[in-house]
Amino acid sequence: MSEDIKAKALDIQKLVEYQDDTVVSREVIKKELGTVTFFAFDQGQGLSEHSAPFDAMVQVIDGEAEITISGEKHTVKAGEIIIMPANEPHALQAVNCPYKM
């Protein structure tokens, strides 16, 4: 974890910024039991289908995400969360607009 963010109130919107035609990530906590990573997806960008050996929570903090879990598409908007179950294939896309999570 970056020392500059410990024990401070942070503006979650400013932890990661959009960049044209790419996905930007910032890992803020990395522990043996899990990580906390912020992402900014430009429109049209995403993460291809994959799975993980643990549950993962996505909280959309700006925009709107299309998240596919085991073939079922979900639209998740700013202020909403979704839990992606362990070992289930999932993918994330910025279809209609950029988003941060």
Regions of interest found by a model, annotated:
Residues T22, V36-A52:
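Conserved short histidine dyad/triad with adjacent acidic residue
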Residues A40-D42, A52-I67:
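Short, conserved beta-strand element in jelly-roll/cupin
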Residues M1-L33:
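A short, N-terminal "cap"/entry segment at the start of jelly-roll beta-barrel domains
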Residues A86-M101:
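Ligand-binding loop in jelly-roll beta-barrel domains
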Residues F38, M57, E72-H74:
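Short, surface-exposed secondary-structure edge patches
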Residues S51, G71, V95:
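Conserved catalytic-core motifs of eukaryotic protein kinase domains, centered on the activation segment
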Residues G71-A86:
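Short acidic-glycine-tyrosine-enriched beta hairpin
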